[in-house]
Amino acid sequence: MSSAVLSPDRYINRELSWIAFNQRVLAQALDQRTPLLDQAKFSAIFSNNLDEFFMVRVASLKSQVEAGITTPSEDGKTPLEQLLTIRERLIPLLQQQQDHYRKQLRKKLLDHNVQLLDYSQLNKHQQQWVSDTFRHSVFPVLTPLAVDPAHPFPFVSNLSLNVAAVIHDPESGQRQFARVKVPQKNLPRFVSIPTELSESDPKPIHTAVPLEQVIAFNLDLLFPGMSVQGHYFFRVTRDADLELRDLEADDLMLALEQGLRKRRMGGEVVRLEVPNDMPEDVVEMLMNGLAVEEEDLYRIDGPLGLDDLFGLMALPLPKLKDKQHSGQTPTVLARTQQHLIDEGAIKPEEFESIFSVMRQQDILLHHPYDLFSTTVEEFINQAADDPQVMGIKMTLYRTSKDSPIIAALIRAAENGKQVMALVELKARFDEDNNIQWARQLERSGVHVVYGVLGLKTHTKIVLVVRKEQEKLRSYVHIGTGNYNSKTSKLYTDLGLLSTRPELGQDLVELFNYLTGFSKQQSFRRLLVAPVTLRKGMESLIRREIEHAREGRDGHIRAKMNSLVDPDIIALLYEAAAANVRVELIIRGMCSLYPGREGLSESISVVSIIGQFLEHSRIFWFGNGGSPEVYIGSADWMSRNLDRRVEAVTPVEDPNLRGRLERLLELYLKDNRGAWDMQSDGSFIQRQPEDGEDVRNSQVQLIKQWSQGVPQS
């Protein structure tokens, strides 16, 4: 467990570090070098990230304040002080986002004949079409709810967009309120209008108006006989974190389902978003009805819920998007694709099973540059159909809908193989999906387990056991990312395919640890949390310190999502004091101060934000000239090291190790998506020097793969 106590001047608050990360995401939207529709995408990601941050992190801090907890975080801030600072940091970012939407995005889309219009900008023909559409496609699903002494304040669901209508009763003379929920789950946020109705010349490629405005300007149909005096939009965010204590739940699935029902009904409101021009009496009515305080209120200068800008990526305008990368099949696996026989691309006698290739060498996969479908999915598909395969075991943390991997596991069970799937039911915001997969797998004869009591299983591992010449051989995949067909195209992740006996035996014992009563305390090659990973990582860092103290080169390079563990940070400061060179590539939260005189002068931190979400974890240690490199599922966070099951594997093939070393070098030289962390914790985006070529690491990797997938 983490035990280091760092003074506030040595530790950056994790919540504020997260906001700095999301600010870098927003910067991608504001950067005019980013293609226009990708600007919309990054703005949507910024909003979506912020929703989850409020639902989990802000909700947790508010709960602490309500419980009277004043214990400071590692940087010396109480929960209340953190909440106030979060608000202070967010308000200017939200204004930047709205300014970009209004002054940049909409105007520049118009230059490309894409019209995102307000209702007031529609011509009479468009308004008539919208009114007709409202009557037959929107009106029937709306439910206006009155707010008065006879009608209690209606429940407002999490992340819902709503219309607050101000109604005047001509008979009584009373001014009343009503709430109408915008049916976003049933209808698109932006209503497409036939382009031929436009009076523009040339005709637009796409014309749309926000659904909430369509509803607002037709409220008279919802309140016949009444006078609609005004309408105002509002959006609510609720506490959505599930508090699950395994020891209190005999049936984890039942407990989760109850928790999910509670989440859908909604926890306490943690954020209320309203437009700047909402009258104070309407604001007061909402605040009282939703039981929110002034610090929970965010006044927004523009449309609410900009996460819906994701929908613009569907527009058929490739010139306004980053060039799409379809991925490649590694050359070494080119003849392992069953579909090539069906398509006549190779002869049946030319086919080579993926198992045959794995017996000859370790294979390093790098997604999305390497196709997930022709590598990891093909591995599991061939295992499901191969008569010599006796069993398949794997962990599932987040998988996609209509998952080919789930289908393969079911087929394997139907083919008589022993199949075990560890489905992590507690994967946040994927719980419902995972419950459905678990039930489907169980019905098909797959042994389904839910992991170790009190721990979340985050490791990404597959074990295939195959009978060969009366002996059993283990084939393994150990990765950094989820077995998810969709995110494999959006996230960068690494995976190792191997038949090394020690790795195979380690996975056999790790799965026994996950499914039985094993108290395994050591592994041959793997570093496993919560058993050996923390000790192993600390030992590797200390070894670099010893190398440096004895006059050899001490050098650490590590790439991960987040670095917030106090013990690891304290040890890295100790490494810096010994003059170990520490180069960190941290996409998200980083609580360490780099480059501080007398503390961390030899430590540098860079963050890469690009077309793909950087998700791979790599740990490289110079070891006095005999480097060792590891990949796996864990960040340097207390939860990964102590409260989750994680697996990190050494990459022992010299060629593959060299590939990873060159990959780290490529990231460190990036001058397009890279942000350098300063000694005060702020970030500055790198820019090419005059005459210097732009080095975008992700674009360079796409180019490398298009010219032939690296094999060594």
Curated annotation (Swiss-Prot):
Keyword Membrane annotated: no
InterPro entries, A to Z: PP_kinase, PP_kinase_C_1, PP_kinase_middle, PP_kinase_middle_dom_sf, PPK_C_dom2, PPK_N_dom, PPK_N_dom_sf
Reactions performed catalytically: [phosphate](n) + ATP = [phosphate](n+1) + ADP
Binding-site residues for ATP, renumbered to this chain: N49, Y491, R587, H615
Gene Ontology BP term (one): polyphosphate biosynthetic process
Function: Catalyzes the reversible transfer of the terminal phosphate of ATP to form a long-chain polyphosphate (polyP).
Name assigned to this protein: Polyphosphate kinase
Organism in which the protein naturally occurs: Parasynechococcus marenigrum (strain WH8102)
